[in-house]
Amino acid sequence: MDADKIVFKVNNQVVSLKPEIIVDQYEYKYPAIKDLKKPCITLGKAPDLNKAYKSVLSCMSAAKLDPDDVCSYLAAAMQFFEGTCPEDWTSYGIVIARKGDKITPGSLVEIKRTDVEGNWALTGGMELTRDPTVPEHASLVGLLLSLYRLSKISGQSTGNYKTNIADRIEQIFETAPFVKIVEHHTLMTTHKMCANWSTIPNFRFLAGTYDMFFSRIEHLYSAIRVGTVVTAYEDCSGLVSFTGFIKQINLTAREAILYFFHKNFEEEIRRMFEPGQETAVPHSYFIHFRSLGLSGKSPYSSNAVGHVFNLIHFVGCYMGQVRSLNATVIAACAPHEMSVLGGYLGEEFFGKGTFERRFFRDEKELQEYEAAELTKTDVALADDGTVNSDDEDYFSGETRSPEAVYTRIIMNGGRLKRSHIRRYVSVSSNHQARPNSFAEFLNKTYSSDS
């Protein structure tokens, strides 16, 4: 008997077959650099920076930017942002810089140039006869890179959210050490003409390079990061959510994973903690691997680890966290089962803490406290008194153990308790639910049961 096959009859003929479903066609690619070569792109011929500045600024004012020219200018302008490396900087075996070295964003990557000239059109508008200053270059670089952040804001965002952000970014780049170089609302108007620029590989690469540089190097123009910060841990929402979850419930990653009672977690946990990746290394290429083109399909995205992502946000919903209530459910990753486990884990970690005295007036008081705690433990071990089983949770030191939670779930037949459902309905019904969000899912699934 083949365990994978089913047997049935069609027109009195016995049929035996193995039902198969579509599997994920994509290969997840890990970002580790194996060849000791810095991330690389190829651009057109390096421009005259003064000419390039005037061209790009005039095109921006006319909302007619050429992405190739913009990328060529951004790469050439890196020379204006020299800084000192505070420590030896290595990643995946590549020496980026040594302590005390003078470096620019260009030191982090390799930019190859061809002999192809850019367009460098002048479209009129703000004619500049003199050569631009460094603050003017910095302002233009900041505004151009902000197009990346604006194009990453999803269409679901409500009201004037994007316009407000664009206006705030403009204010940053017209305040010292930057200078005002465009009229009000230019950034938003330009963005509408460049709404998909976050998908242009070279533009994305340069945004990630600038961000990686300014996140480590103290610099007068570090505020340029306002437009590039979204490249850090891009397409890593699964891993980022897991990290936040760990901090929230005050456990180590190892301790937390012991509570993940579902077979579908196995593959995702293996995927998320693949050896050889610099997930925990500060200032690694890992942080910007998506924008630097080191992986075509992230193994750390919410879709790649959907069961983990769903569980974490159901626990977050139970705890009343707005971020979790607003997050988008990964519909293909057992949301009903994850909501059950999320209810039990939410109950386990919500409103409970492990508290103990840690600070004392002097050493004598510390020693007295430790001695008293030892005596208390000895008394507890000697006491064989029983308690009412309903009160077991309050007396047992093991209430927060994975075994205790697992037993509770099994005893309840793998279903949520009434108290869990009431809590889920309470937090989700008081929230303006976005389409496909966890709040909407909980409302639709459990409101009739409460």
Swiss-Prot record:
InterPro entries: Rhabdo_ncapsid, Rhabdovirus_ncapsid_C, Rhabdovirus_ncapsid_N, Rhabdovirus_nucleoprotein-like. The modification Phosphoserine is found at S389. Keywords: Capsid protein, Helical capsid protein, Host cytoplasm, Phosphoprotein, Ribonucleoprotein, RNA-binding, Superantigen, Viral nucleoprotein, Virion. Phosphorylated by host CK2. Unphosphorylated protein N seems to have a better affinity for leader viral promoter encapsidation. Phosphorylation of protein N in ribonucleocapsid may stabilize the interaction with protein P, thereby playing an important role in viral transcription/replication. One of its GO terms (molecular function) is RNA binding. GO terms for cellular component: helical viral capsid; host cell cytoplasm; ribonucleoprotein complex; viral nucleocapsid. Belongs to the lyssavirus nucleocapsid protein family. Displays a superantigen activity in human and mouse, activating mostly V-beta-8 subtypes of T-cell receptor. Homomultimerizes to form the nucleocapsid. Binds to viral genomic RNA. In nucleocapsid, binds protein P and thereby positions the polymerase on the template. Protein P acts as a chaperone on free protein N to prevent it from aggregation before encapsidating genomic RNA. This is Nucleoprotein. The lineage of its organism: Viruses, Riboviria, Orthornavirae, Negarnaviricota, Haploviricotina.
